[in-house]
Design a protein with these regions (language model features):
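Catalytic core of carbohydrate-active enzymes
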Residues: 1-85, 93-111, 123-124
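Intrinsically disordered, low-complexity linkers and stems that provide flexible hinges
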Residues: 113-131
């Protein structure tokens, strides 16, 4: 689909249509009801092929205003469409209670091709994942 148009689509309760641009990176953690219910030591990245994309995963303690004092972390994530690779770059920053090691489950969605999934362990240093 091209932008700048209205699309009327069936949307039954069990199947919600989503229009996601190529190059988009969507991140989510475990299902929780409150911030510190379970640590988000496993993050899923939904990466949509078709063009390059980038995303900064921002994290803080989720409870205090310490982010105003610079206590937060950012993990830059990039997708290179030509190489079909996802780079999870070096983490910058820190905060109390930060998760140092985690698993990223990366799902690459490519039009007309089965979704590919890879999992990697991340400890704050750059990792390149090739599909």
């Amino acid at each position: 689909f091209e932008g700048g148009q209205t699309i009327v689509a069936d949307a039954p309760y069990e199947l919600m249509p989503m229009y996601i641009p190529s190059g988009a990176i969507l991140a989510y953690g475990p299902q929780i009801e409150y911030v510190d219910q379970v640590p988000a030591n496993e993050i899923t990245l939904e990466v949509y092929a078709g063009s390059d994309g980038n995303f900064n995963l921002y994290e803080d303690d989720g409870e205090s205003f310490d982010y105003e004092k610079g206590k937060f972390a950012i993990i830059p994530i990039r997708y290179n469409d030509m190489e079909k690779s996802v780079t999870i770059a070096d983490r910058s920053g820190e905060y109390d209670g930060m998760i140092n090691d985690r698993v990223f489950n990366i799902r690459l969605h490519n039009k007309g091709v089965d979704t590919k999934i890879k999992s990697v362990n991340y400890s704050g240093k750059e990792i390149v994942v090739k599909f």
